[in-house]
Amino acid sequence: MKVRASVKKMCDKCRVIRRHGRVMVICTNPKHKQRQG
């Protein structure tokens, strides 16, 4: 899980979602997991 100021899609499979007021990226590739913080 990467914590970043700006979360971006890294590939076509990445999805930008909101959970508990946090912007997150979920993907089939676990390296692409990010959350805003």
UniProtKB/Swiss-Prot annotation:
GO cellular component term of the entry, any: cytoplasm
Pfam families given in the database record: Ribosomal_L36
InterPro entries the record matches: Ribosomal_bL36, Ribosomal_bL36_sp
Any one GO BP annotation for this protein: translation
Gene: rpmJ
Protein origin, superkingdom: Bacteria
HAMAP family registered for this protein in UniProt: Ribosomal_bL36
A single MF term (Gene Ontology): structural constituent of ribosome
Protein name listed in UniProt: Large ribosomal subunit protein bL36
Keywords on record: Ribonucleoprotein, Ribosomal protein
Family recorded in the similarity comment: Belongs to the bacterial ribosomal protein bL36 family.
Species of the source: Synechococcus sp. (strain CC9902)
Lineage: Bacteria, Bacillati, Cyanobacteriota, Cyanophyceae, Synechococcales
